[in-house]
């Protein structure tokens, strides 16, 4: 028979060490497989005052020049783009404009060499400086503006404008506490918060001074 059936021809070719034409065509395509990128992210601090910058650093593996998108999500949203160095590292400085809690992530942008990926979220709290005092002695047993009774172990703060129940994170010399707004005040110029005795003790606050506040 002059012509072999396709299946027979393929079997014959394999028996003498040749690859079928279809197999040769498929293997001849030089498809480039993308590798999976890995992005690491580090913040120089996890607490910063509004208006002051922090360093944001990271690395993309495999090394090379890659595009990275940094996203800051919190009271507002900020996006910054950066190109890595040849060794895959990147760095920039970011200055927050509002107080509150942020989650920061780095996204490795998908390109012809790597598939996109994202880093673990890094937490950041931004603060402002706030004048503070404390109250309690002589007032225990009295009601507070947001409901309840002021006692020596009451954890909370008084503020003139924040809604009752608003959670505020305060820092003083490395100590921190998160407490609700429970009362109104202080009605003294230059002061934003009145701390209860229990909050004062928790922070090691002297009585009158400046604290870092997340609101």
Describe each model-derived feature in a short phrase.
Residues 2-12, 16-51, 55-59, 64, ...:
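Secreted/periplasmic proteins
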Residues 63-73:
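Short, ordered, surface-exposed loop/turn motifs in non-cytosolic proteins
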């Amino acid at each position: 028979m002059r012509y072999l059936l396709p299946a027979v021809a393929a079997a014959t070719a394999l028996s003498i060490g040749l690859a079928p034409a279809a197999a040769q065509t498929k293997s001849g395509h030089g498809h480039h497989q993308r590798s999976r990128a890995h992005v690491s992210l580090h913040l120089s601090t996890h607490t910063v005052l509004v208006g002051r910058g922090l360093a944001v650093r990271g690395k993309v593996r495999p090394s090379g020049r890659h595009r990275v998108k940094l996203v800051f999500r919190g009271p507002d949203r900020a996006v910054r783009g950066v190109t890595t160095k040849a060794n895959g590292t990147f760095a920039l400085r970011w200055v927050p404009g509002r107080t509150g809690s942020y989650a920061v992530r780095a996204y490795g942008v998908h390109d012809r060499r790597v598939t996109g990926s994202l880093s673990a979220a890094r937490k950041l709290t931004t603060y402002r400086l706030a004048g503070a005092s404390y109250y309690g002695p002589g007032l225990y047993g009295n009601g507070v503006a947001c409901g309840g009774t002021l006692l020596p172990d009451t954890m909370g703060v008084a503020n003139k404008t924040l809604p009752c129940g608003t959670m505020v994170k305060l820092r003083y010399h490395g100590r921190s506490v998160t407490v609700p707004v429970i009362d109104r005040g202080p009605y003294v110029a230059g002061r934003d918060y009145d701390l209860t005795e229990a909050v004062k003790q928790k922070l090691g606050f002297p009585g009158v001074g400046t604290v870092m506040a997340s609101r």
